[in-house]
């Protein structure tokens, strides 16, 4: 069986996070995933609150854009969480949305170099190494953490394009694949990831829209705008956007198809006004 996670959507009220996290844990999920989009909430503080509100589940950051923080600061923040909550943190890193990075004046000259150099520097710092880097984008001169964690968190990347997927296979512990991608896209992504040198231990994490509803017309009213927007981003018709939208009886079969394609963790992103009942229904159908 895969790991089953749940996303705390960026549009939910921050005050609801801890109750949401506790409910997800009680419902039997393996993970809670948080996001970081410009103007919403910071991922490190969100992850800290989620970890504090739970006792068992893994909390994933999906993702922290690497141009926003020095690798040293990022490692310091992650080390603190990993020490206090050993074995319960996954650090997802990515390029960040180019438009947002330009808004903030932090867009790197080389996105690939920025991501690779950050992943390697952060991993070294979390190991307790004395890290010196003079790369294309990252520059550190003899930095070491005073309190490195005993259990190092996995570092995964949320990336899309072939060269970035190969980079993830080369340097990361896993790869996050965005909503709307199904079994065929998973297999295509894995081809690039493995070309980068990924082993069987590389964790493939897929975000998937969830809306349990037996009425297709009603489901379309709730989810249509989100699906259409993602279809536009992916460059496909809305009908080709993979999702867990529909009758709950279809959820196990769709999840099985993702696992057979190579997915190790499926993160449910519930759509609609009542996310927790949606999550409970899906987890129950999956035998949780």
Language model segments and positions:
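Active-site-adjacent structural elements that line small-molecule/cofactor binding pockets in enzymes
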Residues: 1-288
């Amino acid at each position: 069986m895969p790991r089953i996670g749940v996303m705390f959507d960026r549009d939910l009220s921050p005050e609801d996070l801890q109750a949401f996290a506790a409910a997800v844990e009680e419902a039997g999920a393996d993970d809670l995933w948080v996001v970081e989009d410009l103007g919403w909430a910071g991922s490190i503080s969100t992850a800290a609150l989620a970890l504090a509100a739970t006792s068992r589940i893994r909390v994933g950051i999906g993702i922290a854009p690497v141009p926003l923080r020095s690798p040293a600061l990022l490692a310091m923040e992650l080390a603190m969480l990993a020490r206090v909550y050993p074995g319960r943190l996954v650090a997802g890193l990515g390029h960040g949305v180019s438009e947002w990075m330009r808004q903030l004046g932090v867009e790197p000259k080389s996105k690939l170099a920025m991501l690779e150099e950050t992943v390697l520097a952060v991993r070294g710092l979390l190991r307790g190494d004395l890290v010196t880097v003079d790369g294309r984008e990252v520059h550190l001169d003899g930095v070491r953490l005073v309190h490195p964690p005993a259990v190092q968190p996995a570092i995964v990347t949320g990336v899309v394009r072939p060269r970035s997927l190969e980079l993830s296979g080369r340097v990361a512990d896993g790869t996050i694949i965005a909503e709307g991608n199904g079994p065929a896209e998973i297999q295509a992504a894995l081809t690039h990831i493995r070309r980068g040198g990924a082993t069987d231990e590389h964790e493939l994490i897929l975000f998937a829209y969830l809306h349990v509803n037996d009425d297709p017309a009603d489901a379309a009213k709730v989810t249509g705008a989100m699906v259409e927007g993602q279809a536009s981003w992916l460059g496909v018709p809305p009908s080709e956007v993979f999702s867990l939208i529909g009758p709950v009886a279809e959820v196990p079969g769709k999840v099985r198809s993702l696992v057979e394609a190579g997915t190790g963790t499926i993160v449910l992103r519930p759509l609609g006004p009542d996310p927790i009942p949606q999550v409970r229904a899906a987890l129950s159908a999956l035998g949780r």
